[in-house]
Amino acid sequence: MPPCSPLSNAYGYPLLIKHLLTRSNIASACQEIVSGTEMRLSYADLDQRVRQLANALKVSGIREGMRVGVMDWDTHRYLECFFAIPMMGATLFTINVRLSPAQVLYTINHGRPDLIIVHRDFIPLVEDIKSGFDRDIIIVPIGDGKGYEEWIDAAPDSFDFPDLDENQTATLFYTTGTTGNPKGVSYSHRQLVLHTLGLIAGFGAWPGNAGFHRGDVYMPLTPLFHVHGWGFPYAATMLGLRQVYPGRYDPDAILGLIADENVTFSHCVPTVLSMVLDHPNCSQTDLREWKVIIGGAALPRSLQTRAATAGISLHAAYGMSETCPFLTVADLSSDDPEVQAQTGFPGPLVDLRVVTSDMQGVPHDGETTGEVVVRAPWLTQGYLDNPQASNDLWDGGYLHTGDVGYIRENGSLQITDRLKDVIKTGGEWISSLILENIASSCYGVEEVAAIGCPNAKWGERPVLAVQIKDNTDRDLVRLNIVEEIQMRVDVGEISKWAIPDEIIFVDHLPKTSVGKLDKKLVRQDVLTRLDLKS
C-alpha cells in the first residue's frame, strides 16, 4: 500500500530547541532555577529572559545564521544562551576558556563569531589575544552584577522565535586539539533534540531512584562549554527539574549548594570529584543522596572507593565531543563497584560496534578488542572546514571513536585503550606529539616519547622518556627541557597541565617493525622504573 500523501495543511513538526522549553514553561512554570548565591528564577522567568536575551542580541546586530560566542562560568546566563541563541536562528559558539591563549585565539578566528558575550573574569584573556583577531567582533562584557541584567532588562520580553529548518546548525564548539589544532564540531537542532530524548530515556529507564528523573535536583559540574555540559541542561530543562548552577567551581561552594539546595544528580570528570572529596568540609556534608556520573577520563579505583565511603552513588558513562556526547552508561541500578565502573551499555538508538582495522566485527566475548565505531541520530556529521578529518572520522559509514575496547556477552562495552597516545589528565587532553616536539628541540635530546602514567588524583600525568646524545650531560638536558616547556606555557602555547611530572633517561627507545616508536613498550618500561601499575 503506498504511503499517504501529506495534507497541504498538515504541520510537519520540526525538531527544534525551542520545543524543549515549551513543556517546562507550562508544567513547571514555578519550578526554581538557582545560580550560585546570586540568582533564583522560575521557568516562567527563564522563558521571559530567553526572549529578552534574543531581543538584546538582535539590537546588537545578531541575525539568523550568525554566530554568538560565550565565555562564562556555569551560570543561569549560560543556560539562557543555550536557548536564546539557537532559538533565534543564530549559532551558539561555546568557547573553551581552558585552552591555552594561543588555542583560544585559533578557535575564535576559525569559528568566526560575530559577537562574544564575555564574563569579566575572561576580559584579560580577550584583551591579550584580541590583537590577533582576523575580523571585527562585538564584545559584550558581563559580570555577576548589573552588566548582564541591565543589558537584557532594556530589551522587550516578546520575541517570536521562528520555525527553523531542524537541520540548521544550532551549536559549535572545538575539541581540545590533542593531535594538532582544535577541530570545530557542530550540531543541528534535530541532533540536539534527539540527543536530549536519548539522554532522558537512557538515564531515566532504571528502577527506583537510580538514574535521572523528574524528582532530581540537577547541578552540572562539567563546564557548559564542554559538549553542552554533556547535554544534561537541555534534558533537565525539558523535564522541568529544579536546577542549580554553581558558577566558578569552588569545592566549598559546591558542597554548600549540595547541602542547601538538596542536589541529587551531577556529572563531572574524576578530578572535580576528587577536588570535592578532598575539601575539609566534605566529611560534614551528607552526600548519601548524591548521584554522580563520571566521564571524560577513566575512573580511578581509589576515587571510586572514597566516593562510596562518602555515600555517593557513582557510575561511569562514555562519549566524546563528536558524539554529543552520550553513547553508553553503566548499569545505574547496580551497587557492585565493578559494574558501576564499566563503560556500560549503549544508549537508545546507539548502534555501537567493535571492529578490526578492515571493519569486521569482533566476537562479543569480553576479550577480543578492536576499535569502537558508532552510529546514532545525534552524531556530528564532520568537522568545520576540515573535509579530510571529516572523511577519516566517518570512514566506512561509521563514526570512528579512536578508542579500543571489547564487548561482553551481555552487550556492555569496556574501553581499554586509545588508538592514539593522548594523555588524559583531570579531564583535559594533552597531545603527546606536541610534548615530544618541544622536548626533541632541546639541547642533547636524541629522541623522546611522551606517555601518560596512572595518577590517583588526575587519572594520568605526562612523563617523558628521553634518549640523549652521546657525551651529553643529563642534568643539563633535563634543565633545558624543563625551561623550554615552561616557556611554552608562559607564552600560552600549551596548557600548564602539560608540564611532565617526570623526565626519565633511557639508553634507547624501542621501535615497531615500521620504525615508529613502540609506545606500548615505552610505557611498560617507564611504569616499571617508576614502580607503577597500568
Spell out what each predicted region is.
Residues 99, 105-106, 116-120, 266, ...:
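AMP-binding/adenylate-forming catalytic core of the ANL superfamily
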Residues 13, 37-39, 54-102, 429:
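Conserved AMP-binding/adenylate-forming
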Residues 29-31, 156-174, 180-181, 207-217:
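Conserved pre-ATP/AMP-binding loop-to-beta segment of ANL
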Residues 238, 263-268, 277-338, 351, ...:
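Gly/Ser/Thr-rich phosphate-binding loop
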Residues 351-373, 409-410, 472-478, 518:
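Conserved beta-loop-beta connector loops within the AMP-binding
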Residues 123-166, 193:
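ANL superfamily adenylate-forming
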Residues 193-217, 225-264, 279:
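Conserved AMP-binding/adenylation subdomain of ANL enzymes
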Residues 42-44, 170-198:
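Conserved AMP-binding A3 loop
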